[in-house]
Amino acid sequence: MTDSHAALLEALGVALPAELLTIALTHRSYSYENGGLPTNERLEFLGDAVLGLTITEELYHRHPDRAEGDLAKLRASIVNTQALADVGRGLTDEGLGAHLFLGKGEENSGGADKSSILADGVESLLGAIYLEHGLTVVREVILRLFGELLDTAPTLGAGLDWKSSLQELTAARGLGAPAYVVTSTGPDHDKEFSATVVIGEAEYGHGVGRTKKEAELKAAASAYKTLDES
C-alpha cells in the first residue's frame, strides 16, 4: 500500500485490506486498458444503498415532524453527484481523484476531477467499508463525512426545490420563465451533463451532473442565488 493510500484511509478513519481498497479505487477505464481487472462498480452499487439507508434513517430521526415529501427532498440535497464529488474532493490534500486508478484517456481528459467519477469513487469506498467493517462503522464514517450537509440541508429553504423556486422568483420580478440549455460529454456509459439557465437573453447559472435533471437542478440553484443576491 502506498503512502498516499495510507493518507486516504486515515481521512476515512478506517483500515481496509490492500486488495479491497485497490478494487474500490479502480475505474472501469483503467480496467479496459489493463486486461479486464475488477472495477469498483459492484462496490459502488453496494455503497449507494448503504449511503441512502444511512442518510434516510438519520433524516427520519432528526426531523420527526417533516412529511415524507420533504424528507425525500432533503435526502436529494445530500445524496447527489455534486455533493458526493465535493466530499471526495475533501478527502486528503490531493482529493480522492489523485488516488483513483484511471485509464490514460480518462486521466488525460480530466477524469480525476470529474464529478461523476468522484461520486462513484466515494460510493465504492463506502461499499468497501461496509463489507469489511459492517453497518455500524460505515454509518459512523458517513455521518462524519456528510455531517455538514446533514446540518445545513434543512436551512436551504428554496433548495428543496430549486427549479420551482427559481420560476416563482423570476415570475415575481417579471423576468419571464427560465430556460435550460443542456449539453453532454463523454461516452454513453459515463456521460456528464452540463446545464445553463437562460432568462431573457442572459445566463444566470450553471450546473453539472450525472443526469440531465441533476444538472438542471444545480443550474437552477446557482441562478436562484445569483438573482436573490442582486
From Swiss-Prot:
GO cellular component, one term: cytoplasm
NCBIfam families reported in the protein's UniProt record: RNaseIII
Enzyme Commission number, as recorded: 3.1.26.3
GO molecular function: double-stranded RNA binding; metal ion binding; ribonuclease III activity; rRNA binding
The species this protein was found in: Mycolicibacterium smegmatis (strain ATCC 700084 / mc(2)155)
Any GO BP: mRNA processing
Protein role: Digests double-stranded RNA. Involved in the processing of primary rRNA transcript to yield the immediate precursors to the all rRNAs (23S, 16S and 5S). Processes some mRNAs, and tRNAs when they are encoded in the rRNA operon. Processes pre-crRNA and tracrRNA of type II CRISPR loci if present in the organism.
Binding site for Mg(2+): E44, D120, E123
Name under which the protein is recorded: Ribonuclease 3
Family annotation (PANTHER family): RIBONUCLEASE 3, RIBONUCLEASE III
Active-site residues, Swiss-Prot/TrEMBL: D48
InterPro entries, per the entry: dsRBD_dom (IPR014720), RNase_III (IPR011907), RNase_III_dom (IPR000999), RNase_III_sf (IPR036389)
Subcellular location field: Cytoplasm
Catalyses which reaction(s): Endonucleolytic cleavage to 5'-phosphomonoester
Protein family: Belongs to the ribonuclease III family.
Cofactors: Mg(2+)
Record's keyword terms, sorted: Cytoplasm, Endonuclease, Hydrolase, Magnesium, Metal-binding, mRNA processing, Nuclease, RNA-binding, rRNA processing, rRNA-binding, tRNA processing
Domain DRBM: 161-229
Keyword Transport listed: no
Lineage, top ranks: Bacteria, Bacillati, Actinomycetota, Actinomycetes, Mycobacteriales
Domain of life: Bacteria
Gene3D superfamilies: 3.30.160.20, Ribonuclease III domain
Stretches assigned to the RNase III domain: 19-134
Keyword RNA-binding: yes
Subunit details: Homodimer.
